[in-house]
Amino acid sequence: MGLFGKTQEKPPKELVNEWSLKIRKEMRVVDRQIRDIQREEEKVKRSVKDAAKKGQKDVCVVLAKEMIRSRKAVSKLYASKAHMNSVLMGMKNQLAVLRVAGSLQKSTEVMKAMQSLVKIPEIQATMRELSKEMMKAGIIEEMLEDTFESMDDQEEMEEAAEMEIDRILFEITAGALGKAPSKVTDALPEPEPLGAMAASEDEEEEEEALEAMQSRLATLRS
């Protein structure tokens, strides 16, 4: 506390160093999320291969869509890392300016990067907090609340799924699936005949496993 109970402002250099530390911490969080999603994707690939061997086209399609969602999430996380690197570079520049001018300067590069970062759900809270601190320090201007994802995101995902599903299945099954989705069952091995009760139990177990896998992927992406 300063005189008369007022909070003393931190020196600009200390602020910049604190922001840099927070950003590096968030980058490590993003790295972990990317690794978790990619590990789960490997499990999905194995499930696609198993489903293809059993002739379960519908299961393959559902899993392929999950992979598309996961890859899209990973792509966004990599983009967020690039933006965080831009902010870190901006912080280095601020320290250089501080040594010469004695004060922090407004930065359009940092502003643009932070505008993108506050839209990433995984790091949104921290980035909003940093944005407020940077606005107070005069590095960036007040940002408008235009941080909502496109309302057409789900629709775009479905369209992308239709476009990418052949490629994903072809890639995972080494050509057994993917060229013609409406005809893939013709090229798939016939499932081994099972008793009615055994087949029903297997289907229930597979459905439960599929739902569990979808739930894990959704949790990692949220």
Curated annotation (Swiss-Prot):
The record marks V48 as: Important for autoinhibitory function. Residues 151-220 are annotated as: Intramolecular interaction with N-terminus. Residues 180-222 are annotated as: Disordered. Residues 2-113 are annotated as: Intramolecular interaction with C-terminus. Residues 151-222 are annotated as: Interaction with VPS4A. It is a lipid-anchor. It is found in: Cytoplasm, Cytosol; Membrane; Endosome; Late endosome membrane. Signal peptide: none annotated. GO terms for biological process: autophagosome maturation; endosome transport via multivesicular body sorting pathway; late endosome to lysosome transport; late endosome to vacuole transport; midbody abscission; mitotic metaphase chromosome alignment; multivesicular body-lysosome fusion; nuclear membrane reassembly. The record marks R216 as: Interaction with STAMBP. Residues 196-222, 203-207, 221-222 are annotated as: Interaction with STAMBP. The modification Phosphoserine is found at S200. Pfam families: Snf7 (PF03357). A lipid is attached at G2 (N-myristoyl glycine). Probable core component of the endosomal sorting required for transport complex III (ESCRT-III) which is involved in multivesicular bodies (MVBs) formation and sorting of endosomal cargo proteins into MVBs. MVBs contain intraluminal vesicles (ILVs) that are generated by invagination and scission from the limiting membrane of the endosome and mostly are delivered to lysosomes enabling degradation of membrane proteins, such as stimulated growth factor receptors, lysosomal enzymes and lipids. The MVB pathway appears to require the sequential function of ESCRT-O, -I,-II and -III complexes. Belongs to the SNF7 family. This is Charged multivesicular body protein 3. It comes from Bos taurus. The lineage of its organism: Eukaryota, Metazoa, Chordata, Craniata, Vertebrata. The gene is CHMP3.
